[in-house]
Amino acid sequence: MNTIDLPSLAQATPTIRHDWTREEAAAIYYAPFMDLMFRAATIHRQSFDPNKVQCNQLLNVKTGGCAEDCGYCGQSAHHHTDLPASKLMAPADVIESAKAAKAGGATRYCMGAAWRSPKDRDMAPVIEMVKGVKALGMEACVTLGMLSDDQAKQLADAGLDYYNHNLDTSEEFYPSVVKTRTYGDRLNTLHKVQDAGIKVCCGGILGLGEKPTDRVEMLRTLANLAKHPESVPINLLIPIEGTPISLTATPVDPIAFVRTIALARIMMPLSDVRLAAGRTAMSDEMQTLCFLAGANSIFIGDTLLTTPNPGDNKDRSLFDRLGLEPRDDHGVHEHSSHSHTHDQGHDHGPHGHSHG
């Protein structure tokens, strides 16, 4: 099964790398499951409290009518779904929603707009939202599609903490999912965001019809960026009627999903790894294995954009049974170790999942 020796786990601090090979990443993914879980859990404990989970809440601030053709997304104007397009919400309404999220235990508030890219006139209300969320003492995250350098700078100047922009899958499989933009377009926006000094939230979706090698390659692409994404959301596809991928989606083996979480944790030791969309389709036992494998972040609340979420009562029950607690941010055993190389699903924007 595994022909490459796994490195020793003896080191007390995680090794941050940006030069993973296909062979190394595949060897980790396909390692005997017990060895994989032990390695991931050990690396997780080197930087994080394994009993603390970071909690986010997501709000769709502009729904539907998106010009992109992402094959899984209910918000695309290219697909025949029942989702009506809406205008951008008023900043005051968004901030009221953020207050409720904070009262419910969220430390980060994520705002998604279904755009290919924001128009310059849209930036002022979005910046007002960001500043309002920050004034509540919460971290702010937005996903707005592709950005210009100036738009990224405006968001950074407003104090934005995170920008979500998912790769979704591997570069090879990507054209089977999206045709209105390229993988390079996605990477280009990530670079603009990082250059502006904003932390990156970037992950993908499992269940699009991809092969295991596509999952490995997506994570390898992220792990080989000059700076790892501070947050890596892993989504389980919830097929949406009327989208092309709902006709071709393939169920994901729960063990394969857990392997993907473990690989993300091992290759990006200081990043938050998030169980994003699709938790309603996961058993408590599957989610528990994900937490053991290094997932340390979730979305709370009843909905994520256009898909359901377990809701606070169900999450509270699972946390109680596992002895988990919401993390009082900010971060890794004080997140101080992020600074040395790293500074750390939701495309809630043009996508119909949480992708954050």
From Swiss-Prot:
The protein's matches in SUPFAM superfamilies, at most eight in alphabetical order, are given as: Radical SAM enzymes
Please indicate if the UniProt record lists Amino-acid biosynthesis as a keyword.
no
The keyword Iron-sulfur is annotated on this UniProt entry = yes
Record's catalysed reaction(s):
(4R,5S)-dethiobiotin + (sulfur carrier)-SH + 2 reduced [2Fe-2S]-[ferredoxin] + 2 S-adenosyl-L-methionine = (sulfur carrier)-H + biotin + 2 5'-deoxyadenosine + 2 L-methionine + 2 oxidized [2Fe-2S]-[ferredoxin]
Binding-site positions, [4Fe-4S] cluster: C66, C70, C73
Keyword terms of this UniProt record: 2Fe-2S, 4Fe-4S, Biotin biosynthesis, Iron, Iron-sulfur, Metal-binding, S-adenosyl-L-methionine, Transferase
Protein's GO biological process: biotin biosynthetic process
Question: Record's InterPro entries?
Answer: Aldolase_TIM (IPR013785), BATS_dom (IPR010722), Biotin_synth/BioAB (IPR002684), Biotin_synthase (IPR024177), Elp3/MiaA/NifB-like_rSAM (IPR006638), rSAM (IPR007197)
Which parts of the sequence belong to the Radical SAM core domain? 51-270
PROSITE patterns recorded:
RADICAL_SAM (PS51918)
Which EC number applies?
Answer: 2.8.1.6
Q: What ranges does the record give for the region Disordered, renumbered to this chain?
A: 310-356
Give one Pfam family.
Radical_SAM
List the biased-composition ranges (Basic and acidic residues). 312-350
Any one GO molecular function term = biotin synthase activity
The family annotation for this protein states: Belongs to the radical SAM superfamily. Biotin synthase family.
Share what the entry says about its subunit structure, partners included: Homodimer.
Q: Which NCBIfam families match?
A: bioB (TIGR00433)
Q: What is this protein called?
A: Biotin synthase
The taxonomy runs:
Bacteria, Pseudomonadati, Pseudomonadota, Alphaproteobacteria, Hyphomicrobiales
